[in-house]
Structure formats: C-alpha cells, structure tokens
C-alpha cells in the first residue's frame, strides 16, 4: 500500500484498484484491531471501554457505515458539535448544514490537508443524501419512507465502492496525488505494473517459497507474488463478511478451540516479527 501511494504516477488501472482495496482492508484491520486490543486490556483491569467498530464494511448505506465506524468519535462530534449547533431541531436546511459541518470538521480533525477535507466532505454529502430519504435500502430502519428502494446487495456495493474511492483522498499525501490515482483508474490501462506492486509483499511466511522459486523457477516468482496478493485480499474479504470478534465472544465467551486459535495466532505473529509496523491512526 505504501509503495502504491508513493508510485502513484506509474500505477495502471488494476494495480490502483487493488492497492486501494488493500488500503481499505488495512486501515480497518489496523484501527479495529487496536480498538479490540484496548477493550481486552481494559477488561483485564475491570474497565469497560466502549465498542468502537461494529462491522462497518457490512453497511448498506454511507449513513449506516458511519453508525458502525469509529463510533466513539462520531458520538463526540454529535454531542459537542452537532447538538450545540442545533442538531435537527431548526429545520431541514440547518440540519443539512450541521450534518455537513460534522464531517467537514471530522476530515479537518485528521489533519490540516485538503485531502482530509475532501474526504470528510464526501462523507458528509453522502450522509446528507441518505438523510433526505430519496433512495433507501429495503429493510432499513429509517423513520421516514423513501421515494425509491433498492436491494440491500446493491446498497452494499455502492457503499463499499464509494468508501474505497473516498480513501484515495484519505491515503494520498496531496490533492495532486489523489487526482492522479483517479486518472489511473479511469484510464482503463493495464501495463503490468501489478507485478511490481505485488513484489513488495515481502512477508516471512513467503520466504521459503520465494527461495525455491528463485532457484528452480525464477520466471514464476512474479506470478507467485500476484497470487499471494490476491489471496490476502480474498482472506480479508472473507474475514469481514463473518461475525466480528465481539459477536463471537458474546455468543460463547469461552471456547477451548477459539482460545487455542488465539494463542496459535499470537505466537505465530510474534515469531513473524521482521520490522516495525506503525499504528496508522497514531498519527491522528
């Protein structure tokens, strides 16, 4: 992902799309994982910390996504920005303005960069659109009836696709870099740069396979990296489609099989340490 954002001038359409998809998974697993760790550590000291994520990538509208993503920050902005500005008590126009300001300030909160402002503004505009009730997802819990309804699967595709594209602004260092990535997507070109992008996946578990391929089948190594990249994306997609950790623990607080898997993954993770991995949200 880091390599992709740095080399934005050279990416083609497939490599840009897959890089952004990888970033979408990375930022969620990074932040949600640390939030779960904090909740677990809190329980060790008999401190109940609030849930911060509730499977946001299962949302079928942008409004629903923000009811599931970084819920503590959302509550903060609602309590200290949205409600003091009048909330939804002063007419539709004021409600729209207040909603937009919440997301505008949320973008600014992440950093004084036009990319964050663009990202926050995009979220605000789509949440406002959802609030207008023109189009809604079938089976949603909206109080006001909508003019048109779409299937949940279509709502999910739009929501997940929109959030993917919006993260181009969030992850880019400048507006110029973000615009370049959009140009790459809509250029509809395939220059084979995906092979170079995937070659940056240098994980310890792949070391033995890499050595064998280098010695015996050097021409196959670049394809192996692409397969590994796609496999990681598929695994990530499967994980977010299943029950989250809090749901699993709530259904069955203690299972020997689950505990054994947790211990195994923890030990494996420690053994696989090869470099310092920074917490993305630590910067905000």
Task: Show where each model-derived region lies.
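Membrane-embedded transmembrane alpha-helical bundles that form the catalytic cores
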Residues: 1-233, 242, 248-283
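Aromatic-enriched
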Residues: 235-237
